[in-house]
């Protein structure tokens, strides 16, 4: 789904306040600490709580492999100038219906600053720039208004409600489904360009020092 450009671990995206990069094995402790919080994990389908230490390294390995194979693009969210300090994740992969789907999580210390929206917009922009896909989907639990607001601010349109299996939660839960197409994204960019990707990868692939 993704081209050769994104399949190298020097690939990153820059926004006004964030650097998005491939996850590294050094991110394991941050993932365990932040993703493992109940407030974060309970809104996701696959993040366990508590988060087993060995699961973090496995997640990083599998994520990097999927990125390298072009099957997905999942990036660590870091603050600009602090690229070694993971604060969350954002990624796009195909769901069970083989549709490209975006997902994200942010550690609770970073809530309330608009980082999730900023990161999601950057990855959405890259998705439409670097792939030939015309639509992107997402789902959120009905009890997660914060995630719904992120999707709405990214231009997603509500498609309806349904049920979805949350393996890590051990059951099926009500969700709201959203969809964004290429035309709607182009319209959003036309009046909100400052929130999109500011600079795409450079040839040297270097990240600034932390």
Task: Give the ranges of each region predicted by the language model.
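Acyl-donor (CoA/ACP) binding surface of acyl/acetyltransferases
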Residues: 1-41, 74-210
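Conserved GNAT-fold acetyl-CoA-binding loop/helix
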Residues: 39-62, 73-75
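A generic secondary-structure signal
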Residues: 62-63, 126
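Short, well-ordered strand-loop elements centered on a beta-strand within folded domains, enriched
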Residues: 64-65, 102
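Short loop/turn motifs at secondary-structure junctions and domain boundaries
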Residues: 65-71
